[in-house]
Design a protein with these regions (language model features):
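Short aromatic-glycine-(Arg/Gly/Cys) micro-motifs in beta-strand/loop hairpins
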Residues: 91-127
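Aromatic/pi-system hotspot detector in well-structured domains
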Residues: 75-83, 98-104, 132
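Short, low-complexity, charged amphipathic interaction modules
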Residues: 1-34
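Short, compact, well-ordered microdomains
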Residues: 116-155
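Generic structural signal of hydrophobic/aromatic residues within well-ordered alpha-helices
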Residues: 20, 40-43, 145, 149
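Negatively charged, low-complexity tracts enriched in Asp/Glu with abundant Ser/Thr
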Residues: 36-90
Length: 155
């Protein structure tokens, strides 16, 4: 038996090996969602044009709705894309749910903190569509999409 060592290219994994013809296929390693979603357009691409929230957003755009209304739908799309299919289970107090909450003396302030729920009690000051599955994603969204939050939640 002959052994051949093949170096797997960085950023790839072995997808398949055909023993008949010796063909080795590589596939790119999936990138972290934070690397894939950096803009609203990235979030829309991640969900796909036929996603109901994306379709609703396009309709809302065509109606010429105010920026803060469109901004809310943009946050729904961004949150949904970053959560990668995770939907909060409000009946499960074991799961933490993260929501961005901004504090400030004026509408231009940029301080924020993060809230979660636990199994002893639940505090909810947000709609479930804007909850994240991790603190890391909530912090990322708050920083990366701060302008979208600002236009949605301030006058």
């Amino acid at each position: 038996m002959k052994t051949v060592q093949i170096e797997i290219p960085k950023g790839f994994k072995v997808e398949s090996f055909d023993e008949v013809n010796g063909l080795l296929k590589f596939a790119p390693l999936p990138k972290d969602i934070k690397e894939r979603v950096k803009t609203l357009d990235d979030a829309i691409s991640a969900l796909g044009a036929s996603d109901k929230d994306v379709v609703d957003y396009r309709v809302m755009q065509s109606l010429g709705l105010q920026d803060h209304v469109l901004g809310n739908q943009e946050l729904v799309i961004i949150t949904k894309a970053l959560n990668e299919g995770w939907v909060p289970d409000w009946g499960n107090g074991e799961w933490d749910k993260w929501f961005n909450w901004f504090y400030g003396g004026s509408s231009s302030s940029g301080r924020f903190s993060f809230l979660s729920s636990d199994n002893l009690r639940s505090t909810s000051t947000c709609g479930s569509r804007l909850c994240f599955k991790s603190k890391d994603l909530a912090e990322y969204a708050a920083n990366q999409f701060f302008d979208t939050y600002k236009k949605t939640f301030t006058i």
